[in-house]
Amino acid sequence: MDHTLLYRPEWKQEWHILRTQATDYKTYYAFPALTRCENNVLVTVKSGQKHWGDEQSSLTQVTLNAPKQQVQDVRVIYEKAGFTPQMGEIVSMPNGDVCVYIDMQQCETNHRTGLWELRSHDGGKTYPVNRPVGVINGIEYGYAMDLIAKGNQVWMLVMTFPYQTGGRDREVHLITSRDSGETWEFCANLKELFGFSFNECALLECDEGFLIFTRGETDRHDRKSSADDFASGQHLVVLDENYRVLRSRDYRATTDFFTLTGRPRLYWIKGELCLFTRQWNEDSHNRMMSCDLFRIDPCTLEILSRVRLDEPRFPRQDGHYPVVYTQDGLLHVITYITCDRDQRETFEQKCDLVQLSYRLDEVLGYGKENA
């Protein structure tokens, strides 16, 4: 099988759920996350002015009726002067609550102020609980990057920062809750366990324990610019239930096509292990990016197929924190994409919240022709 072969879907639909044009290009919609609540899909998205360092911003929730493919509701669920809800990871808890874990930052900086929780008891209609997560085993965490529920237990990937309580450096830790997020406890320091630095990452359950995909980064003590991260590894790691590494693969080292990822997500879809991620090209100045799907063998960690879901659109565009759901034979990818109003601007160019849709059997069938 030619692992470098790139597939492009024949059928694709694009729906701009929230358009910055409707706000006279004042709003920068970015960083979606989602959870499924029966027929509804709850999507959180930052409504700000730029990628980071907003003067003011809010966290918006969009409620989609999945079977009808309609927007049911759009409303702000968090807004506070002086603070930026940079991203809100949303999860359906085992007890039925919907929780949002916000990467809270000071306005006009990317200085984290501690992980923040919103909690709903009515399927995301209201969020009466609004509170800091606080210190967990001596550490206050910032960025929440992924959550999974398995039975009555929940796990979350979170990052430490040296200026927060107990934070020695930028490290990704795995924490867990047995009471639907009311209390949390430490599981593992993944930076120490894996032996390398990384930032954005994805978490998924598997028969052996856990799958974690990591976006490598240069150690901040040695990092001169974001271009340095292009040399970093992009690993898929398998852990057992006791958080011991069983096997791993670095796709930067073992393929000639895998580049620096952005905000990866792992899913089981119809029994297939799927990685969705932004892929930068090697030209870090122009920052041409695509949104790609990789189908992976969970035993060998071999890439079975790669599908280009969205082509690069402009130099120095922003976008592609892909989150997905399926409905009636279609794969729906919710992401954010730079609008095409003014290509002369860079990262302050405004973005739309977008849904890209594909035929599920088509995108999962690529690479199986000669299998």
Positions of PLM-derived features:
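Asp-box/BNR beta-propeller blade signature and adjacent active/binding-site loops
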Residues: 1-371
